[in-house]
């Protein structure tokens, strides 16, 4: 088992564990330090604001009556299982894609923990530029976003395997 972890992308589970812990610690701080919808200004454009998200990204289906909690939890568990499978399948040297998978895994699990414990996701990172206010989010959301961006860049810039050259004269291609 140790050899599988060492040689595969499972070696990157440390990153998922650290990000999951950071997500949960910051959410714990939020619910212990702030009342619901209370804000603590850090900069004029950035605050910690305690909010509850009963839906998915941007509160999608947030007012659907409660069934969405189970749907989003099931989706996150399936995606997390698939990401662990991909990590196991990848070589440990595939750094960027393994990093992306680990970040997305940590974000999915961080929000699953909230949904299972509270029935909603705790959000607290609040950016207000005056002319535009971004929906409040959390460390787990940031990890998912960062992992997705890495995957996109990796798809554009990763070295592609060269096709196997067919011997000259072989027309059965």
From Swiss-Prot:
Topology in membrane: Multi-pass membrane protein
A molecular function (GO) term: aspartic-type endopeptidase activity
EC code(s) of this entry: 3.4.23.36
Q: Which Pfam families did the record assign?
A: Peptidase_A8
Catalytic activity annotated for this protein? Answer: Release of signal peptides from bacterial membrane prolipoproteins. Hydrolyzes -Xaa-Yaa-Zaa-|-(S,diacylglyceryl)Cys-, in which Xaa is hydrophobic (preferably Leu), and Yaa (Ala or Ser) and Zaa (Gly or Ala) have small, neutral side chains
Q: Where in the cell is it found?
A: Cell inner membrane
Query: In which pathway does this enzyme or protein participate?
Result: Protein modification; lipoprotein biosynthesis (signal peptide cleavage)
Positions of transmembrane segments? 12-32, 67-87, 102-122, 137-157
Query: Where is this chain primarily localised?
Result: membrane
Summarize the protein's role: This protein specifically catalyzes the removal of signal peptides from prolipoproteins.
Q: Which NCBIfam families match?
A: lspA
Annotated family: Belongs to the peptidase A8 family.
Mind telling me what this protein is named? Answer: Lipoprotein signal peptidase
Q: Which organism is it from?
A: Psychromonas ingrahamii (strain DSM 17664 / CCUG 51855 / 37)
């Amino acid at each position: 088992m140790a050899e599988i972890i060492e040689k595969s992308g499972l070696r990157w589970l440390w990153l998922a564990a650290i990000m999951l812990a950071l997500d949960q610690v910051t959410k714990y701080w939020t619910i212990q330090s702030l009342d619901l919808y209370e804000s603590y200004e850090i900069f004029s454009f950035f605050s910690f604001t305690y909010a509850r998200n009963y839906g998915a990204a941007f509160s999608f289906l947030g007012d659907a009556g409660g069934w969405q909690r189970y749907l989003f939890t099931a989706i996150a568990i399936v995606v997390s299982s698939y990401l662990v499978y991909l990590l196991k399948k990848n070589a440990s040297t595939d750094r960027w894609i393994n990093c992306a998978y680990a970040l997305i895994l940590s974000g999915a699990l961080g929000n699953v923990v909230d949904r299972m414990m509270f029935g909603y996701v705790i959000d607290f990172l609040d950016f207000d530029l005056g002319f535009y206010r971004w929906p409040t989010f959390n460390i787990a959301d940031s990890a998912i976003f960062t992992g997705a961006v890495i995957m996109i860049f990796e798809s554009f810039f990763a070295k592609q395997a060269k096709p196997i050259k067919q011997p000259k004269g072989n027309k059965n291609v």
